[in-house]
Every structure is written in C-alpha cells, then in structure tokens.
C-alpha cells in the first residue's frame, strides 16, 4: 500500500481538483469552485510550477505522472467553469456563455480563449459596479446561449443587449440565480445588467 498522504492514500491531485472545481462552478457551488482555483493559483505562485501530486500540507510530491494532467484540468475549469465559455458548435459558431466572475474579488477583468490553429478567438471583458455589471463579448459570428450568474443578494432590474432592452428568464441553480437568454452575435455584443436596488 501507500503511506498516508501519498498517491491514492490522501494525496492532493490537481487533475481531480480541477474537475471538482468545474463541477462546482456548473452546479450551484460557484464560490467553492473559485476557492479551489484560488488555492491552486497560490500553490503555483509559491512554487513556480505544477506538481503531479501534493501532500495534504501543500508540499510537492517529487515523482508521479505528468504535471500537464493537472494543468489541463485547471485550464478546463477556468475556461468552461469560471469563464463559462463552451463551444457547442464548430469554432464557436454556437456557444454557451455562463461566466461566474461575480464570485471572484475582481471588479474588472479580461478573459481570452479560442483555437490557435484556426485563429478563432473569444475575448470577454467584464466590469461590475454598484449599479450593475457588463460583459463585452468579441467572438466569431455565432448564436450565444447565455446563462449569466447574478451576484449574491442582487436581482436584475433590466437587461440590455447593445443598448436595447432584452427579455430573460430567471433560473435558480442551487442557491445561485442566473439570467437565461439567447442572442445572435455578428462579432461583438455588449450585455448590460442593471441591478434592482429596491431590495438592497
């Protein structure tokens, strides 16, 4: 068998942690998903690299499989979980957009993903204030199925797409509220959520 804290007997596995984070992001446990990502960022910043396995105290285990397994799982967790960008067509001609950025401490950020081989890029800019939040999405011409996480204790008063008011449906996932709507993008759209401040 393995000693306590090694391999299947208690080691911390980045490739498992990445999948757990993605599942948390996509099933109503968004804050837990971010907590996992944040702790992994701290490990990488501390060590300057990624280990295949870690001891429960966070120190690296010197041998094992390829570190790229863990890196790939975390990239997927950020791409499809935190940023919530999923290509459900061909080269993003149809995509799911379900960002979880409100659970992070960032008030403004930019996220870029895509396919290097065919120069397909999805570029998202996010900003949140006391009045609302906004996403500017640069992408190939596509149909975008949007599933937008609302910040805790916030409700949507109005939703605008490129300055025009848009209808949406509320969906509760666990304890998290989402706004659901579909849009057609010709390369760039702006999504603006105005918060209802009457219940704050």
Region locations from a protein language model:
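Short helix-capping and inter-helix turn/linker motifs at the boundaries of alpha-helical repeat units
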Residues: 10-12
């Amino acid at each position: 068998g393995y000693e306590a804290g090694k391999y299947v007997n208690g080691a911390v596995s980045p490739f498992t942690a990445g999948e757990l984070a993605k599942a948390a992001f996509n099933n109503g446990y968004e804050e837990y998903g971010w907590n996992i990502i944040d702790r992994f960022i701290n490990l990488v910043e501390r060590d300057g690299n990624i280990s295949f396995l870690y001891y429960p105290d966070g120190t690296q285990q010197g041998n094992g499989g390829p570190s790229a397994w863990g890196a790939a799982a975390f990239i997927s967790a950020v791409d499809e979980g935190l940023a919530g960008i999923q290509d459900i067509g061909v080269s993003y001609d149809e995509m799911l957009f379900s960002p979880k950025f409100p659970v992070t401490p960032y008030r403004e950020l930019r996220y870029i993903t895509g396919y290097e081989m065919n120069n397909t890029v999805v570029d998202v800019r996010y900003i949140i204030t006391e009045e609302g939040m906004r996403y500017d999405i640069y992408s190939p011409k596509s149909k975008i199925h949007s599933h937008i996480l609302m910040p805790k204790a916030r409700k949507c008063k109005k939703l605008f797409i490129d300055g025009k008011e848009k209808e949406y449906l509320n969906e509760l996932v666990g304890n998290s509220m989402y706004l659901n709507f579909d849009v057609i993008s010709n390369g760039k759209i702006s999504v603006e959520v105005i918060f209802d401040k009457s219940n704050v």
